[in-house]
Amino acid sequence: MAEEESKPVPAEKEESLVQAGKVSQWLTENGFDHEFLAPDKNGVEIIKVSADFLLPTATALYAYGFNYLQCQGGIDLGPGQELVSMYHLIKVGDNSDRPEEVRVKVFLPRENPVVPSVYWIWKTADWQERESYDMFGIIYEGHPNLKRLLMPEDWVGWPLRKDYISPDFYELQDAY
């Protein structure tokens, strides 16, 4: 048994281990609860936080220098699965050729997808969170004007959810 424990890890298994990135290491050092995920194909670091820890983590990332929310969006992992609220942050500074980037993902239950709004940290979240609400039904608590953005106010359902059933007929009201 002792011999089995001391055997080196095969190279193929070693490659499959995900190494924490620079941002994840900084969050860990400063006591922020998160989970690091595999980086995307461009090498952008991805971290996962729970909805309860989004605001403290986002505030810390802003203080760390991630002063630009490039993109916020929703993702549906499939019928019966979780929804994801995703935030792509950039550290805009002197090195504009290769700015530091990180993506934060919050996995939410399909039945009650509620997450705090980051509008008060990055104003660019305003319409982006409204679009995620309109298309996926993700509720951003604390958003100053969370209402439909693209669909009519009386629209039923969330069109970009993978289990959405499109209505056979929708009557548009005359603008006059």
UniProtKB/Swiss-Prot annotation:
The keyword Thylakoid applies. One of its GO terms (cellular component) is plasma membrane-derived thylakoid membrane. Transmembrane segments: none annotated. It is an enzyme of class 7 (translocase). GO terms for molecular function: NADH dehydrogenase (ubiquinone) activity; quinone binding. SUPFAM superfamilies: Nqo5-like. Its EC number is 7.1.1.-. It is found in: Cellular thylakoid membrane. GO terms for biological process: photosynthesis, light reaction. The keyword NAD applies. InterPro entries: NADH_DH_suC, NADH_quin_OxRdtase_su_C/D-like, NADH_UbQ_OxRdtase_30kDa_su, NADH_UbQ_OxRdtase_CS. Keywords: Membrane, NAD, NADP, Plastoquinone, Quinone, Thylakoid, Translocase, Transport. Pfam families: Complex1_30kDa. It is a peripheral membrane protein. It catalyses: a plastoquinone + NADH + (n+1) H(+)(in) = a plastoquinol + NAD(+) + n H(+)(out); a plastoquinone + NADPH + (n+1) H(+)(in) = a plastoquinol + NADP(+) + n H(+)(out). It comes from the Bacteria. HAMAP family: NDH1_NuoC. NDH-1 shuttles electrons from an unknown electron donor, via FMN and iron-sulfur (Fe-S) centers, to quinones in the respiratory and/or the photosynthetic chain. The immediate electron acceptor for the enzyme in this species is believed to be plastoquinone. Couples the redox reaction to proton translocation, and thus conserves the redox energy in a proton gradient. Cyanobacterial NDH-1 also plays a role in inorganic carbon-concentration. NDH-1 can be composed of about 15 different subunits; different subcomplexes with different compositions have been identified which probably have different functions. Belongs to the complex I 30 kDa subunit family. This is NAD(P)H-quinone oxidoreductase subunit J.
